[in-house]
UniProtKB/Swiss-Prot annotation:
Hydrolyzes ribosome-free peptidyl-tRNAs (with 1 or more amino acids incorporated), which drop off the ribosome during protein synthesis, or as a result of ribosome stalling. One of its GO terms (molecular function) is tRNA binding. This is Peptidyl-tRNA hydrolase. CDD domains: PTH (cd00462). TRNA binds at residues 14, 64, 66, 112. The gene is pth. Monomer. The record marks 9 as: Discriminates between blocked and unblocked aminoacyl-tRNA.
Length: 186
């Protein structure tokens, strides 16, 4: 089973924030694959489907960003999901709004949700799809920026990136991730 995890924060006040683009991609995949995301005992929204003959699972941790690993590790253990079958989707300050970048592994890059995953999974060896949100301008604190909403100017590029990231996830169901990287990295 492939597990697609979108990082974000639960609650109405965070729904459309930059930090929640991982949730946006999971919502898009749920729509495409007709998956109903339900609250699971793993402190997250979770649903499964069969896509191109492959079993897939979607997850939106409800632990808040900095504790994402507390949801994902028990889920992987319960369903016996290998680290090779996990793809994590999240926001990246170091990419401009609308850019996506796929990686096979890596450090947290300062992202607290990814730090939590690395801590709870015990490895950096999981696949990632990073969606650019850009950096704050004019000395705005990073926390305020990531918890802020996209500007009207940023929205079209971000909407396109969410669709591209979902397309990459769809391809990753069947294709080797290295091929998906070659097709989607800009």
């Amino acid at each position: 089973m492939k597990l697609f995890v979108g990082l974000g924060n639960p609650g109405k006040e965070y729904e459309q924030t930059r930090h929640n683009v991982g949730f946006f991609v999971i919502d898009e995949l749920a729509k495409r694959w007709n998956v109903s995301l339900k609250t699971a005992k793993f402190r997250g929204l979770f649903g499964t489907a069969s896509v191109s003959g492959e079993k897939v699972a979607l997850c939106k941790p409800l632990t808040y960003m900095n504790l994402s690993g507390e949801c994902v590790r028990p889920l992987m253990d319960y369903y016996d999901i290998a680290i090779d079958d996990v793809i994590v989707i999240y926001d990246d300050l170091d990419l401009p709004p609308g850019k996506i970048r796929l990686r096979l592994k890596g450090s947290s890059g300062g992202h607290n949700g990814v730090k939590s995953l690395i801590h709870h999974l015990g490895t950096e060896q999981f696949k990632r799809i990073r969606i650019g949100i850009g950096r704050p301008a004019g000395g705005q604190p990073v926390t305020d920026y990531v918890l802020g909403r996209f500007t009207e100017e940023e929205k079209p590029a971000v909407d396109k990136a969410v669709l591209r990231a979902a397309d990459a996830c769809e391809q990753a169901v069947k294709a080797p991730f290295i091929q998906v990287m070659n097709d989607f990295n800009e």
